Amino acid sequence: MDINEISSHFSNFSLTKPYLRKQIEQLEKDKEKNPLNSESIKKIFKEKFSFTNFKSSNPNYLKFYYYNSESINDYSWGSSWRSIQIILSYLLSIKNSLNKYDISFKTLFLKYGERTKLINLFKKDNKIQNNNIPNYLNKPFCPFETIDGFADPFISKLILLDFNFSGELLLINDYPKNSYAPKEVFNLIINFEEFVNLLEIHFNDENSTPVIINDGIVSLVITGICVDDNFVYFIIFDPNVKINENCENGIYYIKL
């Protein structure tokens, strides 16, 4: 399944009426699905990806979070939060501090879903000392204010900031029509070719951070890239794993 198919699959998903999603559903313990650890991921990399000139995040620090992991029912709406978990677990693992923090879905969602916390992080990031918040933040953008509880890349950046990690928000070609985040918070608009070039440079680093791509409906994580004379290959961690599907199917490559 490629990115377009995934977006198409979920574009028709809607709720019958708007509401504030402030609760999450706990699954029964016997239905729990555990995130894939680094050993499993290294095995998948070896079996699935035989590219030459393959560059990726360090699999020793990768974990794969996907729908309904940790006994939380987030099927059809939680891919953005799972993407955040993938990034955070990677960055904290590099610092050997993953066990010092609770980055479970439930904790992240309940802590970073509400406006006050996110506004305070925005003020910190922009060195705002008073309450002169830009007007563009008056629109609903927080997960508790939206229909589906989805976390835009803007939310991801603020969460990373709270863990003392930096991030950059880029638009590829245009502002996504389904985004809750204000257009003003993005740093730069680039085309796809520029995006590929940036990824090539980015993944030259042995411990390069995975990259979230998020259109306001579906969130995926790019963990590697291979560029040859004719094609570009992205290694994808896709949290949008169907309920009865093997979670390993959420790790694949797309050829462009």
Model feature map: region roles:
Residues I3-S11, L15-I24, E32, F231-L256:
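Noncatalytic regulatory segments and standalone regulatory/sensor domains
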Residues S79, L92-S93, I172-N173, G224-V227, ...:
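Short coil/turn segments at secondary-structure boundaries
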Residues S7-Y75:
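Flexible propeptides and autoinhibitory/regulatory segments associated with cysteine proteases
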Residues K46-T146, K157-F165:
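Active-site nucleophile-adjacent alpha helix/oxyanion-hole segment immediately C-terminal to the catalytic cysteine
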Residues F10, I147-F154, I159-L170, N244-L256:
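Non-catalytic membrane-recruitment/adaptor modules and adjacent regulatory linkers
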Residues E5, Y19, L36, S40, ...:
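Acidic, Ser/Thr-rich intrinsically disordered and amphipathic helical segments
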